[in-house]
Amino acid sequence: MAFLKKSLFLVLFLGLVSLSMCEEEKRENEVEEEQEDDEQSELRRSLWSSIKDMAAAAGRAALNAVNGIVNPGEQ
């Protein structure tokens, strides 16, 4: 009976150690994913900012071109 008790405790202990290691690895993976998400968000923000700046510059250029056509001598 004592042998079975020791074996059962050993199995439970090893199971807890294994579970603990899996939980730690899972937390590490979640942290890595959060860092990747943050990097992707920063990249998207900078991309949208660049697109917005280019669109504004194109709009100003188009407005200047239209003003040049409509009012050719007033620049």
From Swiss-Prot:
InterPro entries: Dermaseptin_dom (IPR022731), Frog_antimicrobial_propeptide (IPR004275), FSAP (IPR016322). It is found in: Secreted; Target cell membrane. Residues 23-45, 74-75 form a propeptide. Expressed by the skin glands. The modification Proline amide is found at P72. Keywords: Amidation, Amphibian defense peptide, Antibiotic, Antimicrobial, Cleavage on pair of basic residues, Cytolysis, Fungicide, Hemolysis, Immunity, Innate immunity, Membrane, Secreted, Signal, Target cell membrane, Target membrane. GO terms for biological process: defense response to bacterium; defense response to fungus; innate immune response; killing of cells of another organism. GO terms for cellular component: extracellular region; membrane; other organism cell membrane. Residues 1-22 form the signal peptide. Antimicrobial peptide with activity against Gram-positive and Gram-negative bacteria and fungi. Has been tested against E.coli (MIC=47.50-128 uM), S.aureus (MIC=189.98-512 uM), K.pneumoniae (MIC>189.98 uM) and C.albicans (MIC>189.98 uM). Probably acts by disturbing membrane functions with its alpha-helical amphipathic structure. May penetrate bacterial membranes, but stay at the mammalian membrane surface. Shows a very weak hemolytic activity. Belongs to the frog skin active peptide (FSAP) family. Dermaseptin subfamily. This is Dermaseptin-SP3. It comes from Agalychnis spurrelli.
